[in-house]
Amino acid sequence: LKILDDVRKKYNVKTLTDIHIPQQAALASKSTDILQIPAFLSRQTDMLSAAASTDCIVNVKKAQFMSAEDMTNVVNKLKHYKAKEIWLTERGTTFGYNRLVVDYTGMLIMQKTGCPVIFDATHSVQCPGGMGTSSGGNREFVEPLAKAALSDGPNMVPLEEFEGMLKRVLSKS
């Protein structure tokens, strides 16, 4: 947490960190600007309540087993607990075994909540367990998915690990 705090002060940027138990929210909120709720914890009321009770932005990653419509319940819980600002992240939906797919209409549905929507193109190409003994992915699909997402209008597209991709995607728009 000290490193996150140092980075945000030195570079004047917002920092983000996951929390995994409700008790981490208060401590993490002193050192970061955005508390992120991991996908598999995204329906846990105690996690949402703890994150909302801070002054941080709360970013919730949509679990692969949830529909876009289910995120309305998440947003309503966060609003009930007076979250300062809420972001939602689309990361793909489970499609059979070893496959995630992206339903772009889901981003439009989530935008109806009034919250900014982030599209995580790198997670969306993941193939959980797809290598037999480990997870794999299809990097060649990251750029086309990100470009398609930009045309559908998510508010943010994080492009971690892919140097220069944002420039290429935007130049093709």
PLM region spans:
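Short, flexible loop segments at the rims of nucleotide/cofactor-binding pockets, characterized by
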Residues: 12-15, 36-38, 94-97, 134-135
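Conserved residues at beta->alpha junctions
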Residues: 19, 39, 62
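N-terminal active-site wall of soluble small-molecule enzyme domains
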Residues: 1-36, 44-47
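C-terminal helical cap(s) of enzyme catalytic domains, especially alpha/beta-barrels
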Residues: 156-173
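Catalytic alpha/beta core domains of metabolic enzymes, predominantly
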Residues: 43-160
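Conserved hydrophobic residues forming the short capping helix/wall of the S-adenosyl-L-methionine
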Residues: 8, 75-78, 173
